[in-house]
């Protein structure tokens, strides 16, 4: 171990930093128990993305577009084995895991808010907001459709946690505006997240584009002249990823 430390293969605490197996990707709600091995854990928690609002039915001179959905909040941090074990022990031997579902695309209205993802009560990452019902515009006007707001700030409630172990803690990004400029119309792109790309804002002839990966916002939708109403797209689901290091 001394040799490894001298050549820089372990840190001052003696951790080798070797990844033990593939990361554990938790995409469904359940319970988290202490891993059998590992001395250091990187924990990534992603709230779900917001859905996009639907586009309105249009007349021979009407247009409609919605903005993209907002992204979910995100936390990434390190815990030692002793720290994680103590937190699990206090919670009764396991942590309840809640994985937020992506916001549902609007049907005749606004998109849904993404669900909150929780690592017990220790890390809470709210989902992104859905975008509003698509604007009603026309060939003689210019209008903007607001994107979904970002997810609220995450909450880290780990007693005594050294702030240097928090890699990233941030609210999600807002969705992009949709726009209608007299005749052309383009919906807003969904917000990206650290673990996914937002759905693409669609043109009048394109189909819905859901959020990709995890925690990203849905792409907005749009309608050209004389079109039936078009449902919004769905945001990306939340996730928890745990990496175990020797």
Feature locations, PLM:
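Glycine-rich, low-complexity segments
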Residues: 1-28, 132-141, 152, 161-162
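Glycine-rich, acidic and aromatic/proline-enriched surface loops and short helix-turn segments
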Residues: 9, 48, 216
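Right-handed beta-helix
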Residues: 1, 210-224
